[in-house]
Amino acid sequence: MSDLVSQNLNMIFKTPKGETVHALKDVNFTLKKGELLTVLGPSGCGKTTLLNITAVFIRPTSGSIFLNNNEIDGPGVERGMVFQQGALFEWLTVAENVNFGLRMKNNDPVETQKKVDEWLEIVGLKGFGNTPTYQLSGGMQQRVALARCLINYPDLILMDEPL
């Protein structure tokens, strides 16, 4: 079973004025495979901090987070990320951006192209593979980011303010 487990996560920041800010305080949860967790709250309440810890962009002050019974301590293809602004490489084509998600694996070039084409069709971008990403609308760019995330069939999908 794929579980995401947070145990006593704490994140403390120091402001430029030297003040202490507790962005996360003793956060505990278990998310089972197939479940969806939506974190809601006002600006500055720690939503993105929790996401950044889960994606291992930052380390918590204390506590741990586990996926499939393994502590998350570095990047891995078992997690997929869709950023608020897509975070696409504008100088690459749509297909090259989607393929970027597969670069962490050793894949046959023919199989890779087949997978990219399949995902472009799934997200409604069939025929756009050779289009530079910067020429797409915001919604189309979001679909490219989604295809890039899902092409590896991650166990966990992280989305920061999806549209």
Stretches found by the model and what they are:
Residues 40-42:
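The feature captures the beta-strand-to-loop junction immediately N-terminal to the Walker
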Residues 55:
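Helix-to-loop junction immediately C-terminal to a conserved catalytic motif
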Residues 63-74:
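Conserved ABC transporter NBD signature motif
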Residues 92-99:
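Short coil-to-helix segment of the ABC ATPase nucleotide-binding domain corresponding to the Q-loop/switch region
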Residues 131-134, 152:
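Conserved signature/switch motifs of ABC ATPase nucleotide-binding domains
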Residues 146:
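Hydrophobic anchor residue at the start of the ABC signature
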Residues 157-160:
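Catalytic Walker B motif of ABC-type/P-loop ATPase nucleotide-binding domains
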